[in-house]
Amino acid sequence: MRAPLGLLLFALAAHTSTAAAQTWSPEQQELWRVEDQQWKMAAAKDLTWIETMVHPNVSFWNANQPAPQNKASLSRWEKYDTANRTVLEQELFPISVTITGNVAVVQYRYQVAAENYKKERETVTGRYTDVFIKEGGRWLFITWAGGDDPKK
């Protein structure tokens, strides 16, 4: 969001592809669980994921933002977006989980149905590449890039 990140990383009760998960190592599965949990927390408007799952030195760039952002910016915009948007349904589609030492890259697509404060509904799709660093035995988001696909 992973998600909110952008319009979406506030989302997601993710569903994973069983076939993909069956071919992953235990460490890859662990990373996907972290990703899945972040989307679920964001969808539930539980912003504690920012303090518990994001590295203090995070720098990320969502497709809908004018420049890279830091953790303070993430908190500010997630609070705003969470107050103005509700996720109705979401699904994640894992593509890859690559691990090298204490760094991991997770790539996936998503689909989110949401409702804004005006009660207008919209379904969007998009993609993210998230990078994690393992510190103290935990995987933390250190950067990500992506967001909604362009409107057709």
Can you say where each PLM-predicted feature lies in the sequence?
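Boundary at the C-terminal end of the N-terminal hydrophobic targeting segment
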Residues: 16-21
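A solvent-exposed, acidic/Ser-Thr-rich amphipathic alpha-helical stretch
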Residues: 25-30, 41, 46-100, 107-109, ...
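Amphipathic alpha-helical repeat scaffolds
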Residues: 36-40
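Short beta-strand edge/turn micro-motifs at domain boundaries
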Residues: 105, 125-151
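Beta-strand elements of well-folded, non-transmembrane domains
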Residues: 112-116, 132
